A protein has these predicted regions:
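An N-terminal-biased, well-structured beta-alpha scaffold segment characteristic
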Residues: 1-50, 155, 175-177
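Short beta->alpha connector loops at strand-helix junctions that form conserved
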Residues: 9, 30-31, 46-58, 150, ...
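Phosphate-coordination loops involved in phosphoryl transfer and adenosine-cofactor binding
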Residues: 24, 100-103, 176, 185
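Phosphate-binding beta-alpha-beta segment of Rossmann-like dinucleotide-binding domains, i.e.
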Residues: 47, 53-103, 115-118
């Protein structure tokens, strides 16, 4: 093939395909993740990788808020109660919480984390941020408190929202050992990448009421296997990696994907759109 650039959504692009693209200079990804690409091949062959760095932050941050509110307010249980005719019966036994004065730990303070903190502060939450790559002043100027040790911060967190890439360092970062240190009313939200939370350990923690609940938009294997125990766990709120599927975000991502390609060939691509391989 004689093309110079590719726009890529969810298709897998391995070296067995890329090696036929002799003129390829750039791949513009429709999204921010690139698990579906052979990045070693791209680096070896000096192929630039671009992402839609700014398009999805609001949509994902709102999705986190939706999951936090749904879990803490018992939305699923209340909805089921009304639909099953139990308008009053036992609904006062459903355990619910306010967000006011609750402590959230935002793990990863990139574009999404920075959009999330504004929404959490609007609910008058206390915000701790764990990100070794972001300085204390930046976090404090946005109203957060920088924490240096994630293990210590987990012990007091009412909510944990994960916004890290999946790497060898973050794989199974949240395991049973860490979950056992958290509060019994704690809720974990993951809209980043599956595999950062050990799913077997999370299921165990929820079944044994070690923590209160979890909201997952991403999974170690996608689509999630139907025999995954989390499917039947009523203490988990699930969505199919859909936190960016708002009408507005979809439009922004499409435009940004194409614009990045144009900007690259016109030598005016913004640095934050380029992934360092």
């Amino acid at each position: 093939p004689n093309f110079d650039g590719i726009t890529l959504h969810v298709a897998e692009l391995g070296s067995e395909i890329l090696e036929h693209c002799k003129k390829l200079k750039v791949i513009s990804r429709h999204g921010v993740g690139y698990d579906n690409l052979d990045t070693k091949y791209l680096k070896k062959n000096n192929i630039t990788l671009l992402i839609t760095a700014t398009a999805n932050a609001v949509s994902v941050a709102e999705h986190v808020m939706y999951m936090m509110l749904s879990l803490s307010k018992g939305i699923t249980e209340y909805d089921n109660a009304v639909r099953s005719g139990n308008f009053k019966k036992n609904v006062n036994k459903i355990e619910t919480y306010e967000l006011l004065n609750k402590e959230i730990l935002i793990a990863g303070f990139g574009r999404i984390g920075k959009n999330l903190i504004k929404r959490c502060l609007g609910f008058e939450m206390k915000v701790n941020v764990y990100d070794p790559f972001v300085d204390k002043k930046t976090i404090e100027l946005m109203g957060g408190n920088k924490v240096e040790n994630i293990n210590t911060a987990l012990k007091t967190a009412d909510f944990l929202s994960i916004h890290m890439p999946l790497t060898s360092e973050t794989k199974n970062l949240i395991d049973l050992k860490k979950l056992k240190t958290m509060k019994k009313n704690a809720v974990i939200i993951n809209t980043a990448r599956g595999g950062i939370i050990n799913e077997t350990d999370l299921d165990t923690a929820l079944n044994n009421k070690i923590i209160f609940g979890a909201g997952l938009d991403v999974f170690e294997k996608e689509p999630i296997n139907m025999d995954n125990p989390l499917i039947k766990n009523k203490r988990v709120l699930l969505s199919p990696h859909s936190s960016t599927f708002t009408q507005e975000c979809t439009a922004r991502m499409g435009i940004e994907t194409v614009q990045n390609l144009i900007d690259f060939f016109e030598n005016k691509i913004k640095k934050n759109m380029i992934i360092k391989l």
